[in-house]
Amino acid sequence: MAVTECEWASLGSRIGLRAALVLLSGSLLVVLFPLSGLEHQYRTALNILLQCNLWGGDDRHTFTGQTRGLAVASTAIELLVLKQKPTSDVKFEAKAALNQALEMKRQGKKEKAHKLLHHALKMDPDHVDALNELGILLEEEKDIIQADYLYSKALTISPHNEKALINRDRTLPLVEEIDQRYFSLIDSKVKKLMSIPKGNPALRRVMEESYYHHIYHTVAIEGNTLSLSEIRHIIETRYAVPGKSLEEQNEVIGMHAAMKYVNATLVSRIGSVTIDNILEIHRRILGYVDPVEAGRFRRNQVFVGHHIPPHPRDVEKLMQEFVQWLNSEEAMSLHPVEFAALAHYKLVYIHPFVDGNGRTSRLLMNLILMQAGYPPITVRKEQRSEYYHVLEIANEGDVRPFIRFIAKCTESTLDLLLIATAEHPVGLPEPNHGFSECKQTITIKT
């Protein structure tokens, strides 16, 4: 599928960083915090510094990222989460709620049992028995994917738990089959889209519109206040919008430059993806906002919510391993959506840059999709919470929900393109706060 500059979809997220000064052990340290983080994340990172020797020692895990297939949880995750462990009284309450839930289930009152199990896990999120019992209840309700997720979480907490192992062995093949069927559905929609002539006027219009929507949602997720029409004005005229932040407008110009580079230079190129390619993408993304840091690896430790990315001295080695994986037969053998999602996650996990990691990861993801004949995908700003939630789940050890999220976004993008090129086409939905996600799907006749 030939790709023009306009064949971009909307997606966006960035994890930016701001300097904050922290007094620790009589020394003044500079610590970088996420721009998009909430106030409690600042406090969390500060507490981590006060409670552990973050800078000392070599006893650290580094991400080797050997994930194989959608149904396999990611391993070797370097995650430092400051969780308040439940007190003995809270654990007792969770146990009591679990016992009461089992009694309600025995009496056939499944709705009450469901609520009690949720209450038990709210009290004690790592209660393995409650995770197992809620999973069994969800299995009975035919929610196999969520049940399998709960069993996987139980095994993350207690790897040798016999009940969780038995439950997971039962759901795993079913989940694999569900995932593969969904990939097949996406493939059928890609095939239908590719059957539309390249010169189709409706397709050209919607691709052009999706280009601007991509930039709009990418920067809006980060708090950028520019409207879709203002972004179009900046890109088309290169003139500033009066009364708007120049930094916000430079973010738009940087995204435009990076997308043009990927589309014109990398999509149709034959050969391996290199570290230099990734650095060039980042140099354009950040070049108009922070030219000093643009296109080079970070030299400071950073915090991303509860996640502590690898130490800066490990970044270059991890990036070499990442690029080696990108070009490996193992990665190439994956379904394109799974490959693209894993590439996104692995890069954003390493977090090699001071800023712009999310945007770089998403552009790399779309590069992989386009090279496989898929359209670049749309993730709207209204999906921001879900997007970060599944990334957090991946950091906890299960990358499958993130892959499914990317698959859902891929299908939504395909649906929009197919709807727009139907007999009675409609345009892309206008940005608004009430739009959550595109839930409509198109039945493919075989």
Swiss-Prot record:
Motif (Inhibitory (S/T)XXXE(G/N) motif): 218-223
Regulation of activity: The side chain of Glu-222 determines which of the two opposing activities (AMPylase or de-AMPylase) will take place. In response to endoplasmic reticulum stress, mediates de-AMPylase activity. Adenylyltransferase activity is inhibited by the inhibitory helix present at the N-terminus: Glu-222 binds ATP and competes with ATP-binding at Arg-362, thereby preventing adenylyltransferase activity. In unstressed cells, disengagement of Glu-222 promotes adenylyltransferase activity.
Cofactor note: Divalent metal cation. Prefers Mn(2+) over Mg(2+).
InterPro entries, per database record: Fido, Fido-like_dom_sf, Fido_containing, TPR-like_helical_dom_sf, TPR_rpt
Key word Endoplasmic reticulum present: yes
Gene Ontology biological-process entries: protein adenylylation; protein deadenylylation; regulation of IRE1-mediated unfolded protein response; response to endoplasmic reticulum stress; response to unfolded protein
Annotated GO CC locations: endoplasmic reticulum membrane
Cytoplasmic domain ranges by topology: 1-18
Entry annotation: catalytic residues: H351
Membrane topology of the entry: Single-pass type II membrane protein
Domain of life per record: Eukaryota
SUPFAM superfamilies: Fic-like, TPR-like
GO molecular function, one term: protein-folding chaperone binding
Binding residues annotated for ATP, in chain numbering: 222, 304-307, 355-362, 387-388, 395
Catalytic activity: L-tyrosyl-[protein] + ATP = O-(5'-adenylyl)-L-tyrosyl-[protein] + diphosphate; 3-O-(5'-adenylyl)-L-threonyl-[protein] + H2O = L-threonyl-[protein] + AMP + H(+); L-threonyl-[protein] + ATP = 3-O-(5'-adenylyl)-L-threonyl-[protein] + diphosphate
Cofactor field: Mg(2+); Mn(2+)
Transmembrane segments: 19-39
Free-text function comment from the UniProt entry: Protein that can both mediate the addition of adenosine 5'-monophosphate (AMP) to specific residues of target proteins (AMPylation), and the removal of the same modification from target proteins (de-AMPylation), depending on the context. The side chain of Glu-222 determines which of the two opposing activities (AMPylase or de-AMPylase) will take place. Acts as a key regulator of the ERN1/IRE1-mediated unfolded protein response (UPR) by mediating AMPylation or de-AMPylation of HSPA5/BiP.
PANTHER family: FIDO DOMAIN-CONTAINING PROTEIN DDB_G0283145 (PTHR13504), PROTEIN ADENYLYLTRANSFERASE FICD (PTHR13504:SF34)
Family according to the record: Belongs to the fic family.
Subunit structure: Homodimer.
Protein name as catalogued: Protein adenylyltransferase FICD
